[in-house]
């Protein structure tokens, strides 16, 4: 049996790699914490966090965590179908669809998420906290609010039209 995830190309973006120090009786003990975003460039994206005594082990742990956390986000013509706002704690992310040729106008962590997702044209603004982990989580909360044509037709009590939203 062929693994579906192995067939998909993976886009891996390292958001942050922190060296953490713990002071113990004999001195300082160092460990690493990695935060990554993984996507296939076609609508699937996930985030992961991993901690280990070695940086490469922390990155591997965050990769496996991100692959377990993949979710689908509907993309239409290289952008999101409509505007969404996601909040996580004090981080707030505003994401607006953009016309073809605009590019990814987003800062830091949101840019990495959009590139892993496969979005080519987007306008984004991070408000409030600039903690990269909270900004990514706010972005994923915004993705939970993205509706596709089938969901909108169902909410309105209409038949699904393929012509709705292109």
UniProtKB/Swiss-Prot annotation:
Coiled-coil ranges per the record?
A: none
Per UniProt, which keywords does this protein have? Answer: Ribonucleoprotein, Ribosomal protein, RNA-binding, rRNA-binding
Q: Does the keyword Cell division apply?
A: no
Q: Which GO terms describe its biological process?
A: translation
The record's note on its domains: The N-terminal domain interacts with the head of the 30S subunit; the C-terminal domain interacts with the body and contacts protein S4. The interaction surface between S4 and S5 is involved in control of translational fidelity.
**Annotated function:** With S4 and S12 plays an important role in translational accuracy.
What is this protein's name? Small ribosomal subunit protein uS5
The organism encoding this protein is Borrelia garinii subsp. bavariensis (strain ATCC BAA-2496 / DSM 23469 / PBi) (Borreliella bavariensis)
Q: What taxonomic ancestry is recorded?
A: Bacteria, Pseudomonadati, Spirochaetota, Spirochaetia, Spirochaetales
